Amino acid sequence: MGIDHNKRLKEHLYYYSARISRDISNLIKWLVLAVITGCIVGAASTLFSFTLKAVTGYRKAHEWIFLLLPLSGLVIVFLYEKLGKEDGGTNQVLSTVRSRDDVPILSAPLIFITTALTHLTGGSAGREGAAIQLGGSIANQLGRWIHLDEEDRHVIVMCGMSAAFSALFGTPMAAAVFALEVVSVGVMYYAALMPCMIASLVASGFAAGMGVTPESFHVTDIPALTIESGLKMGVVALGCAVVSIVFCIALNGAAGLYGKWFKNKYLRVVVGACLVIAVTFILRTNEYMGAGAELIEKAVEDGQADTFAFFWKMVLTALTMRAGFRGGEIVPSFCIGATFGCVMGNLMGISPSICAACGMAAVFCGVTNCPITSILIAFEMFGFKGVSFYLIAVSISYAASGYYGLYKDQTIVYSKYKAKYVNRHTRL
């Protein structure tokens, strides 16, 4: 009897010691991989940030270069045809996380160069989508080099996404959660939480140490939460949900029209560039070139935005991105949300500054279907003083924006409206 008891005790001790040893080794493995990924992707994203800052500064100092937008478009199409095969963009990264698809290593230098060309010549495009592709491509290649299995490669790609997002924006909390949340709406990849958070923090710290300034804005005139202010913010949030839907439809519609009328990619990008130039000349402003950071700052910090600024940013982004230029739609969605929210705030008699901040988070939520990320972005960029309004804006926008989204490979696993498994792709 005593012998059997001792034997069982030894078996239990062996089992638990082996289990603890396995868990510790797995923890150490992902700590090391996350730090390595954060450093490598952080370095690449820092260089990317400095490059975009340099080309944007050059464009502002030499406004004539905007007329070279058709030429840069031709170069971009040529590079992708000769080197990049078919570009899946951010969708390809999301597909890699969920399936056996790969992000080609060539995606990293291609998206770097072509996004810089787009910003140099004044296309209306963002940078975060490009950074996610950059980080995903580098991390995927790192996973191949060290012979990670399929499941671990999915996690390291998510680490790369988080690291790139964090390095550019300086928002490590939002960046870590974004990678977990964006692939499948309603399901969080918690197995990747620790490595994504570590990679995000390392990349953010690396970028900050190299001189990349984290994005932050000062929100003014934050009102007390009352029934009146809460209802007004609810109306702003509903408007933002509608705007996010219209933005997704505009992007998809522009892609459809370009594809229908201009089968040749070279002709398509030239026509798109000429349309962007024409609209810009008609508007007589260069504020809509690039990501729109100046419009965001003006809306949030000064409470000022032209009435139709959100509309024109939407139009020019759709014309630019769907013609074949590179960059991303995330920062333009920030700009659209901030300017729309600011206008709504002025119309409704509530602080345009807080409405711009809430609009930015709400439209981002509407186009990405990532409510937790959206709330964290608001916290990290605007501070915690307006927390009640951020929660109202993001939650209402998430529910009211339906199943639309920027990414066709994003899956809505569970319904937004009831505890129901739906497993469907987003509408574009």
Question: Can you name each region flagged by the protein language model?
Answer:
Residues 1-428:
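Alpha-helical transmembrane segments and immediately membrane-proximal extracytoplasmic
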